[in-house]
Amino acid sequence: MNIAVSPTAEGSSGRAQVQWSLRWESELQLADHAELAEFFRKSYGPTGAFNAQPFERSRSWAGARPELRVIGYDARGVAAHIGLLRRFIKVGEVDLPVAELGLYAVRPDLEGHGIGHAMRVMYPALQELGVPFGFGAVRSALEKHLTRLVERQGLATLMRGIRVRSTLPDVYPNLSPTRIEDVIVVVFPVGRSISEWPAGTVIDRNGPEL
C-alpha cells in the first residue's frame, strides 16, 4: 500500500472545503494524470527521492495501476488520494478476491483526517463492487498512524506478523523479480466479517503492489 504521510500538519482550516470525487481510471484525462503525478511527487518526495521517481512526467501510479480512485480537491488542487484495484491474492493456501487499497497520500494540512474521509467515500463503492474485503499493506513505522485513523474508528483491522510477496513493476537484470516484505496488513471487512479472513502468515499478491 504505497502511502505518504507528512511529518508535520497544519491547522484544520480548509478541511471543510475539500470536495471528494470518485473517479474510474478511464474517466481521467491527461491533465488529471499530470496534476496527480505532481501531487504524488510532492507527497512522496519527502519520504525519499526514490519513492517519487515512479511519478515522473504524467505517470500517476507507482506499481499496479488503480481502476478506481477517491480524490479530494480544494482551492489548492489535489488534497488527498486513495486508489483501488480488484485482484485475487493468496492468503496461505486460500485464493481470495479483494479490493486492494493503496496510493494513499494527503497534504500536511489534512493529515490525520484525509484517510478517514477518503475511506468513508470509498466504502460505499466497495460495497457496490461486492468484494468481501478491502486489503492493504503498510510498513511497521505507520502502525500507530493507521491504528489511530482506521482501527480505533472501527474501519479496519490491523494484522501483524504477516509477510507479503509481490512482483516488481518492472524487470531488472540485477534484481529478483519478486520481493517479500514484513508489513502490517490492513483489512477492511466489506461483504464478510473479519472472522472469515483466512488464516495464514504469508500473502502472495501475484503482481505488483498498488
From Swiss-Prot:
Gene Ontology CC: one annotated term: cytosol
Keywords: Acyltransferase, Cytoplasm, Nodulation, Transferase
Family: Belongs to the NodA family.
Primary location: cytoplasm
Job description of the protein: N-acyltransferase required for nodulation. Acts in the production of a small, heat-stable compound (Nod) that stimulates mitosis in various plant protoplasts.
Family annotation (PROSITE patterns): NODA (PS01349)
One MF term in the entry's GO annotations: acyltransferase activity
Species assigned in the record: Bradyrhizobium diazoefficiens (strain JCM 10833 / BCRC 13528 / IAM 13628 / NBRC 14792 / USDA 110)
SUPFAM superfamilies in the cross-refs: Acyl-CoA N-acyltransferases (Nat)
EC number(s) stated in the UniProt entry for this protein: 2.3.1.-
Pfam family, one: NodA
Subcellular location: Cytoplasm
Gene name of the encoded protein: nodA
Broad class of enzyme this protein falls into: transferase
Descriptive protein name: Nodulation protein A
